[in-house]
Amino acid sequence: FRSRTGTAPNGTGTNDAGDYNYAGADKNEYLFSRGRAAFMYTHTPEALGFVGDVAYWDQTGNDGFTVEVSIGGSKQTLRENTDKRKQTPSYFTTEFTNGDKTITVTEVKYITYTNVMVANFTITSTTGGDVTLTAASPFAQDGNDGDTELTGRFNVKNDLTTIYPRFSGNGFTVKNGKLASTLTLEANVPQTTKLQLGLIANELPDSTAEYEARFNGDLTDPAASYKDSVTTYNRWWVDNIPYVETQEHNIDKTVFYRWWLSRFNMLDANMPGNTFQYPTSIEGVLGYNNQIVLTSGMFIN
């Protein structure tokens, strides 16, 4: 129901009464995938990585991470093929090509339940040769050249908690405060790699476990990491939400949408102190962030 492709909705449509226009079309730019505390307050899908304003309960003002592609030391300008854009509540995918269309990058990105931001990249070259990926994150910049990980420390809004970001990728090593990896491609034979930024919080020990499984554990494989995150998300619905089917499709659609909206607005940060120590709903999570105290009992239950 929540799947979207391309840049729809784009503000126009057609029904029995004819063509119509409406305001507020988002062009499929907001990222539906989110963690129990982390999400993209704003999202720039036409750039590789998690570009936009990352939120951890609220805005941080930072990108998650950016990714550059270069060939022979020459940075490539990539353009998104928006027709390839597809989004579901558990992942977002799109495709990029360089100017002469010799390089294609298919990106699949998602945020795990415990706030690990993961991007899988499948890269194809029509000519073969070396392709270098360089990734940078304002959250994690500490590490010596040759290390396999960058780290950092960040106090979230109002100093409600501190997160300890960890940033790594398959075959990536630290160079000048960034992560870099060079892939040697055969012509028209795709290779897949991935990057992960874990927004680690001491009060959420699973955030460390989920990150380390992707860093050097049993989910280092991009396909395994993706499958684990998507099936975990889908299983949450099976375990927590009753299935509703009526004779009226519009009723079903409304019920599904409201359940999804409640899930998207849910904050389960387990923060210390008398702030967000319990699950709650943040009404308008991409807007005015009004906590609905009335629903706390329901979410705790």
Where do the language-model regions lie?
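Substrate-binding groove/exosite segments of carbohydrate-active enzymes
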Residues: 225-301
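Terminal accessory carbohydrate-recognition/targeting modules of carbohydrate-active enzymes
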Residues: 1-249
